[in-house]
């Protein structure tokens, strides 16, 4: 009798583990809004769920960092009031875009494991409304709560840095010796001292590259590198760098704003208001990393060498398709025109 009971108990535990495992696998493939980039690990740990959403006051759009509103998890988003607000605050340190609330916020169940940054963050930790990314080590990330009306960025123990990009060109040199800020780029350099070209296309630590003038001239010695057209911020896979090219075939450096027009023109120091999304998919392999990166197809338009393993989450960003703790579902179907 005891043996039967033991077998039954073990079977139940085993079945429970399988169910939990399947649930975990499902949770990490959750999608996010088209203006968000999925972090490299723990997609289910991005935003905390909050059950008191019914009592949440309206968002003060003019000063979001002082607002204490919360956004509920994905299954409750349809019940959130004030859908016209520019943004919602989540757990004092997060905001999510208000344009599409259908599938933005995954569950976050390890709120107590997060280290919060003080509210007096410098301007260097603000994020432009068109750019967002989250560090790969979500289990021990630090949140930055200096945000604008649309986006939030996260750091991971001072290692991951996101860049604010507000114009087509940068006219000042970045001081590579220390943290550097101008109105276009914010850099906390580690690898960046290697790059002395007057362009503002810099490698940030080992994990991020930012677009800029003549970015195609930067290839990291000793590391596999990829050149990708248009705006692309890619989380780390080891030390791979991703740098968008800028040359005769890619004079399209502009901030996409999802206007109706889908053409893009090159203008000096002026933000373009249109975004030709199809060029996001043209790329060039620099040092043979095809086994690590790939692109989804955009309306049949594709330029370059054999497929690389990067999958597109939205028009502006690409994220690695595989790491030991991360998976991003591949975009399927034709890309729609940029939304207004």
From Swiss-Prot:
Q: What factors induce this protein? A: Expressed in the stationary growth phase. Regulated by Sae, which is essential for emp transcription. Repressed in the presence of glucose as a result of a pH-mediated decrease in expression of sae. Also under control of both Agr and SarA.
**Record flagged with keyword Signal:** yes
Instruction: From the Swiss-Prot or TrEMBL record, state where the protein is found.
Output: Cell surface
Q: What does this protein do?
A: Adhesin that binds to the host cell extracellular matrix proteins fibronectin, fibrinogen, collagen, and vitronectin.
Q: Show which residues constitute the signal peptide.
A: 1-26
Q: In which organism is this protein found?
A: Staphylococcus aureus (strain Newman)
UniProt keywords, alphabetically: Signal
What gene does the UniProt entry assign to this protein? ssp
| Gene Ontology CC annotation, any one | cell surface
Give the protein's recorded name.
Answer: Extracellular matrix protein-binding protein emp
- Asked whether the keyword Membrane is assigned, the reply is no
Additional detail? Strain Newman has emp expression enhanced compared with NCTC 8325 derivatives.
